[in-house]
Amino acid sequence: MANNSTSLPMCSINITEGIYLETANTQIFKTIFMPSFVFTTIMFLIGVPGNALVFYIYFAKWRKTTGRIFILALTAFDMINCFFTMPMELAVLSNFIMFDHGSICKYFRYVTFMMNSGSSFVLAGIAIDRYIRICMPLRPQLRTKHSKVVVFIALIMSVVFAWPALLLYGTQTIPIPVPGKQHICIIGKTCLYEDHFLATSYPLIFNIVLLIGNIIIDIGLITCYSLIGYQVIKRGTAVEPTSSVKMRKASISTMSTDDNILDYKRPEEWELHPLSSPENSVNVSAEKNEKQNSPDKTKCKVTMQSSASKKRDTFRQRSLSVSSIEARRTQMYKTTSMLFMVTLLFMGSFVPYCVIVMIRSLNKDYYHNLTSIGKAVYNLFLRFYMLSSSLNPVIYCFMTIQFRQQCKDFFKQIKCRRK
């Protein structure tokens, strides 16, 4: 995802192989690409086992939800980046001027652009799903079949945006003057824009389209999550406490009006309730003595106790339903927070790349005028997009209790099998 080409100097002797080429490659690796190589290696070591574990747990252990589909899609894109593009990136970095494999380069760069574009479109789908769930809870919600359609559309869009990489990228010639020896150049080959595209505007157009697309998606993501955050804060400070109390009061009120169950006293107290007329007090006492041994009286007691028990069970069920609603809402907020952090990491990891592309578009000689340290930092920043592919499992682990527990259970099972 970089273009570090140089203009062809005037050389009468060109060295295309041998010890000079290998020495120059080693020197360039040590002075410019070593930080990028170490960074990519770390991302590979974190991302490969992390994404494999995430994919297994969400595929085999998680219940089917829209969030599960989206996370599986993101993880699949990240896994391909980690398993395929990162090893290829390491190969290019360690043999930067000795990588003469045009076809491999084309597919390598194409897959990189495709996976990153796919992730951005899936994250856009996630933001829309979260927005509908939190800001428009009464509207029809996305279901698993809808989330699969979103993932399919994201895949198609990623192909549409990435296909120019198959044409533009390939083997590029890099002439390197030999210090102290005039008119002698080492001719290197690397994986960048092909030579015949360097004098055209196609690479610039490709970068501008990707940059504009990235900015549009970022604006959409920021807008969605800003509205979500506003709604969560609004409910947390004003609506949530009152609505919670109202829900409890509604349950109690409903229970109190259901045959006045909360006003029921013990059966004997209910029966001994005095009548308002004083002259009927003797008759009441007499009727009481008569009914104490009556079978109807026993049946009445059983009926009333059964009714009271049912009402109490109903009250408990409605209280539990309120708690269940609150628990589900809390879980939804936690899931949204986790997916927001994944989105934030994705956006942040692409900021250095976008900035460098903008600078490079405005000043074509920017890279050539940098010192060796500057070139090292430049190439390191260009590969910051790998952060998103490798660190997403870390976010899932730190922000999802259930995921952590599933990981513990998974490793316990492995440990038990070894024993």
Predicted features along the sequence, with ranges:
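Loop architecture of class A 7-transmembrane GPCRs
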Residues: 18-25, 99-109, 161-215, 220
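Extracellular N-terminal segment of 7TM GPCRs
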Residues: 1-49
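Class A (rhodopsin-like) GPCR signature focused on the TM5-ICL3 interface and adjacent 7TM helical core
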Residues: 122-134, 166-176, 208-244, 338-360, ...
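Extracellular TM2-ECL1-early TM3 structural module of rhodopsin-like
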Residues: 29-41, 66-128, 133-143
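The cytoplasmic-loop to transmembrane-helix boundary for the fourth helix
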Residues: 139-159
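Intrinsically disordered, low-complexity cytoplasmic regulatory segments of eukaryotic proteins
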Residues: 177-189, 229-326
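Seventh transmembrane helix
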Residues: 337, 343-358, 377-419
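Hydrophobic residues within alpha-helical transmembrane segments
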Residues: 42-45, 73-76, 87, 107, ...
